[in-house]
Amino acid sequence: MKALSSIYLFILALTLGVEVAIGLSAPVLFRSDLYITPGTLSALQAGTLLAQVFMKYNYIALFCGFFALLFEIFSWRGSEASFGLKFSTLMLSLIIAVLACLFYYFTSYITAAAALGESAIDENFARIHEASETTLKIAMIARLGLFFLRAKISVFAPLKSKSK
């Protein structure tokens, strides 16, 4: 179980790293005029490129979300952690899995709308886009919380019991 816990923490950290990288690259793509010849990349083209990045990210987020949920479900009985800690990690993993599915839906919608061109970018598109950004931010916060709670259970709790 120790090796699987280490892999689990690595997957959570890796996904967080991908989310940070996406968060850093999105503004660069949408403000490409600051870095390359102005007019080289339209907002629609930048969005199309970023949508491809998000489609690939979705696979990582979905895998991480459902791996986390399954890990927390199956480790429930074997864990010596308090009920509150186990319940928190289970709920955070459920939130992460649900948000990954929601983000996948948003990305599919945004990609389909962008494929239709400028005419599809309306108020509804803007609301969906904003909701997808909020979803990603909440998922990052939940994943970060889950990482630290799981590290407390998997890494620090065994160290405490050995020192007694």
Task: Label every model-predicted segment.
Residues M1-L16, S82-S93, G145, L149-I153:
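Alpha-helical transmembrane segments and their helix-start/interface "positive-inside/aromatic belt" motifs
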Residues K2-C64, S75, S119-D122:
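Interfacial loop at the N-terminal end of multi-pass membrane proteins
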Residues L12-I22, A61, G65-A68, I96-L99, ...:
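Helical transmembrane-bundle signal
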Residues V20-D33, L69-W76, A100-T107, L144-S154:
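Transmembrane helix-loop junctions and nearby membrane-interface residues
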Residues V53-F54, D122-M140:
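Individual transmembrane alpha-helices with interfacial aromatic-anchor signatures
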Residues F71-S93, S154-K164:
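Cytoplasmic juxtamembrane regions at transmembrane-helix boundaries
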Residues F87-A112:
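Hydrophobic alpha-helical transmembrane segments of integral membrane proteins
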Residues T111-S119:
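Membrane-proximal helix-loop-helix units in multi-pass membrane proteins
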